[in-house]
A protein has these predicted regions:
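RNase H-like, Mg2+-dependent phosphodiesterase core
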Residues: 1-205
């Protein structure tokens, strides 16, 4: 049976130590192209939208439906690490940087940031990591939706600009379609040259 994310952790923290409490997650660590997008979300306990869940198990139309409700009821910050930063700093450091930028972009400073995964960025607030946090914690699940929808929209736009690559479909992930486009048309400025599949396509590995 699928695990349902709850607001229990946040509610306990709010009762014991107070808030604000932000959930932080990212989208786009694995793709061969495009940015990493991180989001930080502070949910209003009195106005939590229905339907929030782990973005990886929601259908695209479900994510698109819940996205505006999160944006309308929560405090949201977004951070984007571009391909240059990914190639320069490596994917992990670029992801942590994007997370820190997302928290900085919040209009209020959180007391606690709940981070999906097992590594936390350096922040000016308390942090706590939570493995599979997007499946357990509503604030992180909301951040996962915001990050995923934001990144997907960027990749759809990129697909219109570069129609031979199919970015609007695979979102930069290593699908057979993407592999064929790389081998046929070569890498673009949006491809991550620090990733081995791109290096192979460029004859650098």
């Amino acid at each position: 049976m699928a695990i349902q994310a709850t607001f229990e952790l946040e509610a306990n923290e709010l009762m014991v130590k107070g808030g604000p409490i932000a959930g932080v997650d990212e989208a786009g660590r694995g793709p061969w192209a495009g940015p990493v997008v991180a989001a930080a979300v502070i949910l209003d306990p009195e106005r939590i939208p229905q339907g929030i869940g782990d973005s990886k198990v929601l259908m695209p139309e479900e994510r698109e439906a819940i996205f505006p409700r999160i944006m309308a009821t929560a405090i949201v910050g977004i951070g984007i690490a571009d391909v240059d930063r990914i190639d320069r700093d490596n994917i992990l450091n670029a992801t942590l940087w994007a997370m820190s930028e997302a928290v900085k972009a919040l209009s209020v400073r959180p007391r606690l940031a709940l981070i999906d995964g097992n590594k936390a960025p350096r922040l000016a607030c308390e942090t706590r990591t939570l493995v599979r946090g997007d499946a357990l914690c509503l604030s992180i699940a909301a951040a996962s939706i915001v990050a995923k929808v934001t990144r997907d929209r960027l990749m759809v736009k990129l697909g219109r600009e570069l129609p031979h690559y199919g970015f609007e479909r695979h979102k930069g992930y290593g699908t057979p379609e993407h592999q064929y486009a790389l081998s046929t048309h070569g890498a673009t400025e949006h491809h991550r040259r620090s990733f081995r599949p791109v290096q192979l396509a460029l004859g650098l590995a």
